[in-house]
Amino acid sequence: MSWHQAVWNEPLIFEYKGKGRIGFKIPEEEELKKEISINIPEKLRRKEIDLPELSELEVIRHFIRLSQMSFGVDNGMVPLGSCTMKYNPKIEEEAELLTQNLHPLQDDSTVQGILEVLYYMQKWLAEITGMDLCSLQVPAGAAGELAGVLMIKKYHETKGRGNRDEMLVADTAHGTNPASASMENFKVIYIKSNSEGLVDVDILKEIVSERTAGFMLTNPNTLGLFEENILDIAKYIHSVDAKLYYDGANLNGILGVVRPGDMGFDIVHLNLHKTFAVPHGGGGPGAGAICAKGEMVNFLPYPLVEKKDGKYSLSYIPKYSIGKIATFYGNVGNVVRAYTYILGLGAEGISMIGKMSTLATNYLISQLKNVRGLELIAPYRPRKHEVVFSAKTLAKETGVTANDVAKALLDRGFYAPTIYFPPNVEEALMIEPTETEPKEVLDSFAIAIKEIINTAYSNPKEILDTPKNTSVKRLDQVIANHPSSVTPTYRVKRLREEGKIGSLK
């Protein structure tokens, strides 16, 4: 496929030099004083607000140009493994806009509509995951992980178990799990995979002890494989009254087919910004949910919506709640997006997500499994939502690495897959097509991979020089990631240009 990205010499919006141009008239200070009785002390007032002066047309053109130099799901396939970059139906945006004039401090009686949405989302997500109750208070995925860890920690504290200081984490779990456990001072112990890419149950049995607080894993795992021994794993964890935590990063591969709660999981966190089609990866913020079963319901973050006498209220606080993970009630706008997604698909549509995402992955595998230079752990095992190929042989024979393959894909109109993760796969290319990509796109992606690898064997320099068709060409990654080069704000950029902050050349 022939593809070239736009290249605009577009300045930062703060660098526009116009004067007296406006797109929106802000009331003058004297006008504001007449309307509101706020007198800001002189020492707290800004002398100069330092905002650019632009017309509405200039602002529109600025952001349109930036969008043309960007890439997202609306442009083409984004096969980022463990990210579930599916298409986000645009009707969700209309539904989310309905929340814009609501305020979280309004009295419950004035926001019955949104409370009803939250109430049913709590119920629907519990039903989908096989849990008893869900809290929507967590704002994103990593916050959901932390909430789960806090719940496990508090559970053992209520039992007087100060010795429960070990958190087991599968080496094929989601990448942020160890960090979440470490934040609560747990000693992280990795459970290695066997030759099949699954949790090694024999190793698990040896490590589980009276010091084990819980086990964090996801199913399917990060290799896209279903943990077929999950019921035995749950039995071993529960034998010492530890808790089994489910990371929802990979739920898309089984959604509507099997449920974590039926596998023995005690806590489930969900990413509404992955599985339930809320925009993310530059289109954020995300949104999360944390669900619990049995006695772990008592530890959920508050508040939760309850219904009494036909009225909804944010009055339910679980007995041993870990408290709030964020302010107010989570990212409510994104909860509404996910609500719209579930409502639009219905039970029948939801039941097809896991099946279609699995079909897409295995179709891609059928196209790529015999490609020279690529290897696959347990190639005879079907995958679920994603697949991880190793480009180790390709790198050894041609010098073209997984990173180079990813760069070359950009030149062909595809976003790059996740690379070098999980760490137990050398030169990893983690590909997740999702259920929303049509067969023709999957075929084009497979053809692109084959072309890149064939070129790597015949003319590796051509691949090493990519990307050429993108707005930004290949960066010096050492300089780009060095602390003295990272420029997070316009003010930092300006200070660098003025020589007031050093930079790596």
Curated annotation (Swiss-Prot):
Q: Which GO terms describe its biological process?
A: glycine decarboxylation via glycine cleavage system
| InterPro entries the UniProt entry points to | GcvPB, GDC-P_C, GDC-P_N, GDC_P, PyrdxlP-dep_Trfase, PyrdxlP-dep_Trfase_major, PyrdxlP-dep_Trfase_small
Cellular component terms per the entry's GO annotation: cytosol; glycine cleavage complex
Keyword list (alphabetical) reads: Oxidoreductase, Pyridoxal phosphate
Q: Which PANTHER family match?
A: GLYCINE DEHYDROGENASE (DECARBOXYLATING), MITOCHONDRIAL, GLYCINE DEHYDROGENASE, DECARBOXYLATING
Q: Has the keyword Nucleotidyltransferase been applied to this entry?
A: no
**Family per UniProt?**
Belongs to the GcvP family. C-terminal subunit subfamily.
How is this protein named in the record? Probable glycine dehydrogenase (decarboxylating) subunit 2
Q: What does this protein do?
A: The glycine cleavage system catalyzes the degradation of glycine. The P protein binds the alpha-amino group of glycine through its pyridoxal phosphate cofactor; CO(2) is released and the remaining methylamine moiety is then transferred to the lipoamide cofactor of the H protein.
Q: What class of enzyme is it?
A: oxidoreductase
Cited SUPFAM superfamilies: PLP-dependent transferases
Q: Which residues carry this modification: N6-(pyridoxal phosphate)lysine?
A: 274
Is Oxidoreductase among this UniProt entry's keywords?
yes
**Which coenzyme or cofactor does it need?**
pyridoxal 5'-phosphate
